[in-house]
Amino acid sequence: MSLQEILLENTKKAIAQHYGQQIENIEIQLTRKEFEGDYTIVLFPLLKFIKAKPEQIGEVLGAYLTEHVAEVTAYNVVKGFLNLTIADSYFLSFFGEIAAQERYGTTPITAESPAMIVEYSSPNTNKPLHLGHIRNNLLGFSMAKILEATGKRVYKTQIINDRGIHICKSMIAWQLFGKGETPESTGLKGDKLVGKYYVLFDKAYKEEIAQLIAEGKSKEVAEREAPIFVKAQEMLRLWEQGDADTLALWKQMNQWVYDGFEVTYRNLGVSFDRNYYESETYLLGKDIVQRGLEQGVFYRKEDGSVWIDLTADGLDEKLVLRSDGTSVYITQDLGTATKRIEEDFPKVEGMIYTVGNEQDYHFKVLFLILQKLGFAWAKNLYHLSYGMVELPNGKMKSREGTVVDADDLMEEMVQVAEELSQELGKLDGYTQQQKQQLYRVIGLGALKYYILKVDPKKKIAFNPQESIDFQGNTGPFIQYTYARIQSILRKAGELPMLPTSGDLHPKERELIKQLSLFASVVQQAADTYSPALIANYVYELVKEFNSFYQNVSILGEEDPAKRSLRIHLSRKVGEVIATGFDLLGIEVPERM
């Protein structure tokens, strides 16, 4: 039982004994820096149940805990806070337990571990990945790692939107303007080549619309009758009919895109266990609609279309099958979800969809329908919704070719890291290859940390220069502290024995207290689907270590026991930084 749990149980006993109340929710937190103490019990919420002043309640609880909990050596009450001082022996004992633990703060996966699916990325195959995809991929991949760290088996998936009019636009533009261009002949990544033709389609389409309007057509008619758009629609019809030439071109251009995506994913450091393709799933779900009709969950209108009425649940009526029997997006999503969980991964308990907040309503509807259809796992579905990412100069559109390209942004981050590192001039003795690797670790670490430190639901204004600062709440600042710790450990040589008794310096206590929070932060990040909690915890730990580093001597300490403890503390902080950053998909350099 942890000290927090011991304090919690004894506080409940004290309240029951003195006030005759059973209170479950008692808030215990680390004592704020300006107060004396280690742990604080917040008294204000207790006033709802106990008719007494907070100071009186604090005195009663403080006296009880000092008497009944050996680790509590003193207490003080400041307004609505009971601050408890904990014995050095407890902190030394606790640190002794975690010092030897590998991957402290995480839970190993076993044969009995529950399983989850995490879906992320899910791009269209008509253009390269952009800045928005970077946030999506980083969130999904990090959540998968965090869930694994809490003992869950995780399957990482994406559904690639590889069919529809948007693909046909790139295909028809390539036929009209491409002159047989390939990634090999142009030296362009395949996704960039296909994206180039998506932009060319849009340019030609706008020119044709303008021409038709000039000839006297209305804007609406011009948009519908523009020859290049008519050709794209005809291509979609041929694809749906299984025309061999159309399918061959579709497969060829999609493969170019997949090859390009693979390079981007590899550079970003994300991966998948299973890919799904919309061309293989878009017919799924019709059997689910039939089942829903039989159950009375869905109803058929006079025109033959199938609907569900969700007005009693505060939502609208929702179409689930068109009158001509063709599916809509929700139909496919119903089919794909049941295929994944009932067939492909039958031991899975739930699924997380990493999708932007513009789809919030869609997922409310999807999850509610699956619950009404009686799927037990539907209650374990979660939409990891996130806000838009913008650059300082505003948002981006892909049809006009002004999108912030993911590959270009990653390269820019590496370039900025190189320029800054050369300014600092601390790379003597590095080979050129080592330097390039370090620039990549710093640049991508800066990008990932800047995005993941923000709560997913908030918008991000991404500033490359700000993200790569070596001071403040940034990836490079944390990486630099990690490298500093590794330097200390190299100079220390063989690890000395860890002392089990002695007095602690206040900075040592603070560091151990900060380390003690890590396991609960990992669990909380999993429970709330927020990698930001881990990012900001690691930053707080690093700030605490730097304060420790500036206020005490580590290698220069003459007392062997104190020197030993400080080396072990440094080592453990380094390990927790590395573990925390690993959960965010960020590398840490041994030297900087």
Region roles according to the model:
Residues M1-L92, T110-M592:
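Non-catalytic interaction-recognition regions
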Residues A100-A111:
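Flexible, low-complexity linker/hinge segments
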Residues S93-A99:
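Short, charged, solvent-exposed linker or helix-capping segments at domain edges/interfaces
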